[in-house]
Design a protein with these regions (language model features):
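Glycoside hydrolase catalytic-domain context in secreted enzymes
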Residues: 1-574
Length: 574
């Protein structure tokens, strides 16, 4: 057994994690100590692998030490499922918040943790609890709404479930509630606003025992979040007594490696990038002491020891990934997430036995529309589209489908219009112009330790992946929304279909609020969200009464965009 394993055994007999971790950290030489404080993959080989799809192929290793047996981290992302391999894709987090079912969210977390472990990961970075300040935020779908209490309770539930199998990480700490300007915006907030509005949900997840916290890209009150002693030390550790470790957001999460160590950031993710050379220089120059470097290493190793019993258990077989049981939970979650916004004359539930002819319209009806295409993207082995779900529920009916031909609805017993957004309209966003200003954070391409020719370390085993066909017309652009309304052609289609068929149901796919000036035209309106791999079946279940639509909005929907304050997506007012 390794030295780490011996320490883990002593932990089961009542040994103290800090004492055992201290003994291990003291055994590390200076190079090993510094290597514990960033990713294991050198930057240029790593970024090449990541941008060619590696983000979705394997977990990302960090903080390993082979000599002492410190296992380190094997990171995968979320939150709608495990992003590596072909995992179960649940509805997005905002949809799950609409269920108001904490027990269900904990079950979702347990499945995600189980699939993460089966896929070679030990660390899940998908507990996102950033507060929804404005529905135009492009990554609203990854969080749970606009209420700090609900955010905290759902984040805690997901954490409890995930940590049955792997470590969890809550993100993005803090005030990361806009996308386009996240790399440069400075959020100014009073202590009262921070502690009453923007931080309580993080505290709740910390109190639930989360292993780790991820800092945010933006700055708060003049300090980059990855270099903020106010956030990472004063609030997180001194006030909240957090005893886990802190990682940076990926690639652009810190600007000054030395300052980040002093502030309380423990691990630079996901590569050996800025710290690898700069911390060696700072240690040699006396800018940092060995004790400065031992403190973050101690927090990482102590957390690994606390989770040793969970992580040393045998990993589930890969067959659990997207298993029938997990798909069934994805379907149930989509059912409970759906929100019935209007239902004139009790149109729903509709009697399926009376349907001889149904018109399914809208450009999203036959699209595998799962949400954001960035770091949270999940690639399930199959997706049930709204059209497929409705067709499966009506095996004897004539199902007519067209993206735009409203006339199809004229003679149908029921018309269903599927409209909304895709990953092209909202989601994660890296502006090439903005990222160019951050290229200075990259090491030289010929760096012997981090450059193109640096050797790749052994990576965690990658699960098998099957390709999934996608609608090639749906291109990932994302970012913050420029409007809260549907596309003009979608709004026009709704009006046209409702004008020729009084039994029209509109299903809206989105990650947060949509302004609906057309809402009185159709008989019924459902908020379908990005409903996951079983969303089409869940839609049919609700429309035809197999289940009741029990979801409730986790935010307010304004009647008009002007009812909200201006959303300065580009931080142009700074």
């Amino acid at each position: 057994m390794s030295e780490f394993d011996d320490a883990a055994v002593r932990m089961t007999a009542g040994a103290d994690a800090i004492s055992e971790a201290s003994a291990l950290v003291e055994r590390l030489n200076d190079d090993e100590l510094i290597d514990l404080l960033d990713g294991d993959v050198p930057f240029w080989p790593g970024i090449t692998d990541m941008t060619s799809g590696g983000y979705y192929r394997h977990a990302w290793p960090a903080s390993r030490n082979q000599r002492t047996g410190i296992p380190g981290l094997a990171f995968t992302d979320g939150p709608r499922g495990v992003v590596i391999g072909n995992a179960t894709c649940f509805p997005v987090a905002m949809a799950r918040a609409a269920s108001f079912d904490l027990a269900l969210e904990e079950q979702v977390g347990a499945v995600i943790g189980r699939e993460a472990r089966a896929s070679g990961a030990t660390y899940f970075g998908g507990v996102c609890v950033n507060l929804l300040r404005h529905p135009a935020w492009g990554r609203a779908q990854e969080t749970y709404g606009e209420d700090p209490y609900q955010l905290g309770e759902f984040g805690a539930a997901l954490t409890r479930g995930v940590q049955r199998h792997v470590m969890a990480c809550v993100k993005h700490f803090a005030c990361n509630s806009m996308e386009n300007a996240r790399f440069r915006v400075d959020v100014t907030a009073s202590d009262r606003a921070l502690h009453e509005v923007y931080l309580p949900h993080f505290r709740r997840v910390v109190e639930a025992g989360v292993a780790s916290v991820m800092s945010a890209y933006n700055s708060v009150n003049g300090e980059w979040c990855g270099e903020s002693p106010a956030l990472l030390t004063s609030v997180l550790r001194d006030e909240w007594r957090f005893d886990g470790f802190v990682i940076s957001d990926f690639i652009f999460g810190l600007r000054d490696p030395v300052t980040s160590v002093r502030a309380g950031l423990d691990v630079e993710m996901p590569f050996a990038q800025q710290r690898a050379n700069e911390l060696r220089r700072a240690l040699a120059a006396g800018e940092l002491s060995r004790a400065d470097l031992e403190a973050p290493a101690l927090r990482v190793v102590a957390t690994l020891l606390r989770f040793a019993a969970v992580l040393s258990a045998s990993a589930p077989p890969i067959t659990v990934v997207a298993s029938a049981e997990h798909r069934a939970l994805a379907r149930r979650t989509a059912q409970e997430s759906m929100v019935l916004l209007t239902n004139r004359d009790a149109l729903l539930p509709f009697d399926a036995t009376s349907v001889r002819k149904i018109a399914v319209l809208g450009r999203l009806a036959a699209v595998a529309n799962l949400g954001d295409g960035g770091s949270s993207a999940v690639h399930p082995p199959s997706v049930v589209t709204p059209l497929e779900g409705l067709r499966a529920a009506l095996p004897d009916a004539h199902v007519m489908h067209h993206d735009t031909d409203a006339a199809l609805a004229r003679d149908a017993e029921l018309a269903v219009v599927v409209v909304g957004y895709t990953k092209a309209d909202e989601g994660e966003f890296v502006d090439p112009g903005t990222s160019a200003a951050l290229f200075g954070l990259f090491p030289p391409m010929d760096d012997p330790r981090l450059g193109r020719d640096a050797p790749m370390p052994d990576l965690p085993p990658a699960p098998p992946s099957a390709p999934l066909e996608r609608d090639e017309a749906v291109m990932a652009v994302g970012g913050d929304r420029r409007s809260l309304r549907l596309r003009p052609e979608d709004e026009a289609l709704i009006e046209e279909v409702a004008a020729v068929n009084s039994r029209t149901v509109v299903a809206v796919m989105a990650g947060s609020a949509v302004v609906m000036p057309w809402i009185d035209a159709p008989a019924a309106t459902l908020l379908l969200w990005y409903p996951g791999m079983e969303g089409g079946h869940a839609l049919a279940d609700v429309v035809f009464g197999a289940v009741a639509p029990s979801g409730h909005l986790p935010f307010a929907i304004p009647r008009d965009e002007t009812d909200l304050v201006h959303f300065d997506a580009d931080a142009a007012a700074e």
